[in-house]
C-alpha cells in the first residue's frame, strides 16, 4: 500500500465519529495498537504495523504525529495477511497529532 493511496479525513473527532470496518468486511476486529510516531517515517510506520499484525484478524495499527508532521496514520489489516499490503485500509487523520486523536472505541 502506498501513502499516496491513503484516504484522508480532515474533520475526525474522537468520541463523536466512528470508523466502521465491520460492516464493510463482515468480520470481527482483532487487536488495536497505538504508538507515538513522531520519530518515524512512512517506511518505519509500515514496518511497525506489520510487526503488530497477527495475520488472523483485522488488526489495527495507529501512530499519531507520524514523522512529527501532526497527522495520525491508521491502518487495518483487512486481508488478514499479517503484512501491510494492497488489501489493507490506510487512513490519514489530518491535523490530529496526540494520543487522544483516536481511541479503540472509535472503531467498530
Predicted regions mapped to residue ranges:
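Acidic glycine/aspartate-rich repeat arrays in secreted/surface proteins
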Residues: 1-108
